[in-house]
Structure formats: C-alpha cells, structure tokens
C-alpha cells in the first residue's frame, strides 16, 4: 500500500486548490444546518464526490479528482446511500446506548445493589459498543468500494461477502483505517492552528478543508486495497 501517494495525490492535480476549496465551502455551509437535516444533503454530496474519487482511482485515472459540475445530484444520492448503509451497520451500537442510559440511571438510585448492577451494565455496554464501532470501521472500506462500483445500496448489506473480503484483506484494512484516523487527526490539528493564525475566522474554511482532504486520503487508501484484492 502506497500511503505516501494517498497523502500527495490531491496536490498533484492541476486544479487541486479549486476542487478542495469547493468541497470545503460545501462542508462549511452544510455543517451548521445538520441539526435541521438540510445540512446532510451537502455532506452527502461531499461523500458521493469522495466515492467517485475512489472509483476513479480504481480505474487507474492519473488525476482522480473530478470537476465540480454536472453530477451533484448523482453524488448526493450516492452519498446518502453510504450514510444509510453506515447508519444501518451502526444500529447495534446505537441501540446499546439505550442500555447505557438505563445503567446510568440505576447507578444514581439509593439501592446499592441496583447501583452495582447499573455500573456493571455501563461497563459491559461500553465494551460491546467499542467492539461494534471497531467492526463498523473495519467494514467501511468494503462498503465504500461496493457502493462506488455498483451504486447499489443493497451491496452494502451482503454481510457474508463483506465479511469474507474484509477477513481476506484484514492487514491492509487495519492499516487503512488507522492511517485514515491519523490523517483526520493531523489534518484537523493543522486546520485548527491555521485557523488560529487567521484570527479564528479562518476556522470556517480551514477545518472543513482539513476534513475534506482527510476524507480524500481515506478513499484513496480504500481504492488501493480494492485494486489489489478486487471488490
């Protein structure tokens, strides 16, 4: 896996600044409106754009960043499919949060026995939730590759094939996930400091830009696994 290429390919595009700026502006405008759901449409467009980048990398395009035109509705639908797939895969962890809340309430009762049971429940739920979130992170490359290639949300729920593919490529999948997390942390840290240097106002652009670039790094890593192993 060429990790360096995943970090550098964005900046090798002749129009990288324009493309990154547009993606960053979409994120900057969308994030404040996620509470009223409208913002999710912009986030979906960015996610769909990233999946197109993944597809282009797998097809061997030298400059895989597409132009921001003509395909916005297509990207939005593709991005919504990705979000739906990840939401469904995340449901077990989200449902466990109900028991976490119940355990917390039991801990604050006057009964020592209930408090002990509540504490044990919170600990067990925390471990199970962490385990499931790790599973979701590990299957995300396979889900992303399938959606990018087929556009069929049903392909994200073929549990057997996703499990087999992930297990067969588990070494590279773990590397890709860890590098993706590191890229997000590094990018957001740089974006935060850049925003401070720009008198905080710069955060409006620098943090969305950092998030956008980190996302592009992730899909390039996923595409590399797909190229080696097949979808």
At which residue positions do the language-model features occur?
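Interfacial aromatic "cap" segments that immediately flank transmembrane helices
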Residues: 2-29, 68-92, 138-190, 219-231
